[in-house]
């Protein structure tokens, strides 16, 4: 029915052209968006496999459809590997995204109107940690904690004070733009004091945690969620894990299916299983160590050049660059760097006077550049080029000079060998 010779190029040249253009963009641009990474050809092969054809509502051994014997093997491998990799007692690999993983936890553990304590968006939290436009801020009574104005670090005293005042049913720890080590045990102690459930969203640092480069929350939190891309470098998807608790596991599984999703994406789950196996290889720890070294090298250059790095450095894969002092908007900086083939994302910074669509900062991450082979010297050079552009906003000559250097280093360090 489907000959092997069938191709996208012949049938849909418009889509093929867009794919090829994106391949060129990824090869010729430097990727500094902290939530992005490059998936291996093995991961992409799984996502393009015949597993995409199979509907498999339910869980391994307990499906609502027949013919699931092979996808049962795939999903169980993913579950077992996730538990082994992170030291969890149970895992649900079906969430389609990190946001849906978090949504399932909310649905499983809370009722509408319950109080949730999470990090505010402008302090580095995620939409699903109680932001007003998100379901977590609309369905639940969201109380937000932030950073210490002097240190740029999480204000644990504020967290404890808010917890005592508002008695949240659940406390959410984790972030999308925080560059330091989180004291998971401090959150545990606060949660225990007020009788709250502790959810940790480690989406950004899961790869670092898997490699032992960043402290693990899995044995501390009641429930841990993550994505499988970002620092893990796998397919786009979500994962929920926890300590031994049959009650919590059952609630979570029911909230994922049938509560929030129907059929799982078994081709993506296969890719997750491969990603977990990749993270168990000897070279993965070296990669994650280099991710941190490269982020620290870049942050150091910005500080030396007089830019403000929130919390004055980084202990993970990302950092926030505040441009308030330079009176440059994140939107303008993002656009200028984009013209030099450097991809970043504008980001709100603590006490940002500008709107979330404009912002006064940039979020910079090192997973992608490290994946393609950047070392500290390359990272420092790159940070210097970014400084050159930011110090000469509007100078297209500087942008063109940097763009040439970017293309040279990208050619030297390709993402996918041809």
UniProtKB/Swiss-Prot annotation:
Pfam families per the UniProt record, alphabetical: SHMT
EC top class, as a word: transferase
GO BP field: glycine biosynthetic process from serine; tetrahydrofolate interconversion
Disulfide linkage: none
Cofactor(s) needed by this chain: pyridoxal 5'-phosphate
Keywords, comma-separated and alphabetical: Amino-acid biosynthesis, Cytoplasm, One-carbon metabolism, Pyridoxal phosphate, Transferase
Keyword check for Cytoplasm: yes
Keyword Isomerase: no
GO CC annotation terms, alphabetical: cytosol
Catalytic reaction equation(s): (6R)-5,10-methylene-5,6,7,8-tetrahydrofolate + glycine + H2O = (6S)-5,6,7,8-tetrahydrofolate + L-serine
Source taxon at top rank: Bacteria
Compartments where found: Cytoplasm
Pathway where it operates: One-carbon metabolism; tetrahydrofolate interconversion; Amino-acid biosynthesis; glycine biosynthesis; glycine from L-serine: step 1/1
Xref: InterPro entries: PyrdxlP-dep_Trfase (IPR015424), PyrdxlP-dep_Trfase_major (IPR015421), PyrdxlP-dep_Trfase_small (IPR015422), Ser_HO-MeTrfase (IPR001085), Ser_HO-MeTrfase-like (IPR049943), Ser_HO-MeTrfase_PLP_BS (IPR019798), SHMT-like_dom (IPR039429)
GO molecular function: glycine hydroxymethyltransferase activity; pyridoxal phosphate binding
Main location: cytoplasm
Cited NCBIfam families: PRK00011.1
Function: Catalyzes the reversible interconversion of serine and glycine with tetrahydrofolate (THF) serving as the one-carbon carrier. This reaction serves as the major source of one-carbon groups required for the biosynthesis of purines, thymidylate, methionine, and other important biomolecules. Also exhibits THF-independent aldolase activity toward beta-hydroxyamino acids, producing glycine and aldehydes, via a retro-aldol mechanism.
Quaternary structure annotation from Swiss-Prot or TrEMBL: Homodimer.
Protein name in the entry: Serine hydroxymethyltransferase
UniProt source species: Alcanivorax borkumensis (strain ATCC 700651 / DSM 11573 / NCIMB 13689 / SK2)
Classification of source organism: Bacteria, Pseudomonadati, Pseudomonadota, Gammaproteobacteria, Oceanospirillales
């Amino acid at each position: 029915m489907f000959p092997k010779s069938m191709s996208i190029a012949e049938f849909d040249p418009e889509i093929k052209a867009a794919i090829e253009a994106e391949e060129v963009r990824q090869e010729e641009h430097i990727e500094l968006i902290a939530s992005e990474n490059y998936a291996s050809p093995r991961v992409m092969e799984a996502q393009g496999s015949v597993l995409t054809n199979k509907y498999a509502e339910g869980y391994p051994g307990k499906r609502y459809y027949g013919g699931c014997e092979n996808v049962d093997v795939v999903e169980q491998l993913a579950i077992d590997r996730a538990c082994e990799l992170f030291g969890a007692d149970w895992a649900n690999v079906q969430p389609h995204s990190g946001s849906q993983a978090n949504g399932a936890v909310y649905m499983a553990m809370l009722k509408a109107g319950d109080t949730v304590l999470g990090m505010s968006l402008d302090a580095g939290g995620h939409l699903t940690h109680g932001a007003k436009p998100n379901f977590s801020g609309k369905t639940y009574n969201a109380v937000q904690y932030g950073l210490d104005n002097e240190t740029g670090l999480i204000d644990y005293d504020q967290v404890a004070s808010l917890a005592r005042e508002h008695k949240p049913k659940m406390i959410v720890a984790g972030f999308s733009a925080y560059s330091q080590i989180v004291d998971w045990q401090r959150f545990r102690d606060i949660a225990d004091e007020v009788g709250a459930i502790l959810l940790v969203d480690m989406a950004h640092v899961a790869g670092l945690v898997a490699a032992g480069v960043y402290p693990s929350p899995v044995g501390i939190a009641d429930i841990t969620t993550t994505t499988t891309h970002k620092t893990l470098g796998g397919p786009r998807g979500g994962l929920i894990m926890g300590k031994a608790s049959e009650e919590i596991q059952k609630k979570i599984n029911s909230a994922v299916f049938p509560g929030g999703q129907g059929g799982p994406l078994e081709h993506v789950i296969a890719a997750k299983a491969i990603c977990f196996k990749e993270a168990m290889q000897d070279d993965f720890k070296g990669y994650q160590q280099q991710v941190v070294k490269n982020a620290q090298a870049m942050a150091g250059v910005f500080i030396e050049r007089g830019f403000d790095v929130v919390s004055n450095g980084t202990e993970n894969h990302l950092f926030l660059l505040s441009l308030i002092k330079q009176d440059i908007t994140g939107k303008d900086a993002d656009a200028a760097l984009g013209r030099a083939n450097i991809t970043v994302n504008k980001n709100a910074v603590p006490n940002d006077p500008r709107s979330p669509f404009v912002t006064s900062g940039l979020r910079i991450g090192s997973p992608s550049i490290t994946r393609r082979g950047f070392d500290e010297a390359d990272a420092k050079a790159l940070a210097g080029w970014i400084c050159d552009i930011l110090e000469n906003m509007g100078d297209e000559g500087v942008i063109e000079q940097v763009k040439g250097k970017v293309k040279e280093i990208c050619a030297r360090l390709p993402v996918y060998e041809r």
